[in-house]
């Protein structure tokens, strides 16, 4: 088992519902530590840059519009197999398919407004963390 870091974003829909603490509590109860966190209002350029891999997909414009519609919480989670653990906690991308008790089943509205983002691989985690955080902003715990 590897100690890993992953990026988590609490998306505008979940921030608007005021469930930030409930979501973060789930991370901590699962053994993940929050080692960096900040609230941001993403600009269009920031959202487009972060989701650049989806630029040619038909949903790109809607995704960027949604991610800039309100503040988000970006955070780095650390722990044993953090990437897989976070993805298990989040549940399926489509909340209608998400298992009961997952973040998306409990807090998401739709496949677009699905409450949270999490890195899907070690390579994505490294790139996504570096997109939002400098090394000096990540605190060992």
UniProtKB/Swiss-Prot annotation:
Keyword set includes rRNA processing: no
Gene Ontology process terms (BP): CTP biosynthetic process; GTP biosynthetic process; UTP biosynthetic process
Keyword entries, A-Z: ATP-binding, Cytoplasm, Kinase, Magnesium, Metal-binding, Nucleotide metabolism, Nucleotide-binding, Phosphoprotein, Transferase
Transmembrane segments: none
GO CC, one annotated term: cytoplasm
Gene: ndk
Family affiliation: Belongs to the NDK family.
Function: Major role in the synthesis of nucleoside triphosphates other than ATP. The ATP gamma phosphate is transferred to the NDP beta phosphate via a ping-pong mechanism, using a phosphorylated active-site intermediate.
Annotated organism of origin: Chromohalobacter salexigens (strain ATCC BAA-138 / DSM 3043 / CIP 106854 / NCIMB 13768 / 1H11)
UniProt subunit comment: Homotetramer.
NCBIfam families: PRK00668.1
EC number: 2.7.4.6
Cellular localization per UniProt: Cytoplasm
Active site (catalytic residues): 117
Superkingdom of origin: Bacteria
PROSITE patterns cross-referenced by the UniProt entry: NDPK (PS00469), NDPK_LIKE (PS51374)
Enzyme's top EC category: transferase
Residue ranges that the Swiss-Prot or TrEMBL entry lists as coiled coil: none
MF terms (GO), sorted A to Z: ATP binding; metal ion binding; nucleoside diphosphate kinase activity
Keyword Oxidoreductase: no
Protein name: Nucleoside diphosphate kinase
Record: residues binding ATP: 11, 59, 87, 93, 104, 114
Reactions that this protein is recorded to catalyse: a 2'-deoxyribonucleoside 5'-diphosphate + ATP = a 2'-deoxyribonucleoside 5'-triphosphate + ADP; a ribonucleoside 5'-diphosphate + ATP = a ribonucleoside 5'-triphosphate + ADP
Cofactor: Mg(2+)
Cross-referenced InterPro entries: NDK-like_dom, NDK-like_dom_sf, Nucleoside_diP_kinase, Nucleoside_diP_kinase_AS
Chief place where the protein resides: cytoplasm
């Amino acid at each position: 088992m590897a100690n890993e870091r992953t990026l988590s974003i609490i998306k505008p829909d979940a921030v608007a519902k005021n469930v930030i603490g409930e979501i973060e509590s789930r991370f901590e109860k699962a053994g993940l530590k929050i080692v960096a966190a900040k609230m941001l209002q993403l600009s269009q350029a920031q959202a487009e840059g972060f989701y650049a891999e989806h630029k040619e997909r038909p949903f790109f414009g809607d995704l960027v519009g949604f991610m800039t519609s309100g503040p988000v919480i970006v955070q780095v989670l650390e722990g044993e197999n953090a990437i897989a653990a976070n993805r298990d906690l989040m549940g399926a991308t489509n909340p209608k398919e998400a298992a009961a008790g997952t973040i998306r089943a409990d807090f998401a509205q739709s496949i677009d407004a699905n409450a949270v983002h999490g890195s899907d691989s070690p390579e994505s985690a490294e790139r996504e963390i570096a997109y939002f955080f400098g090394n000096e902003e990540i605190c060992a715990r």
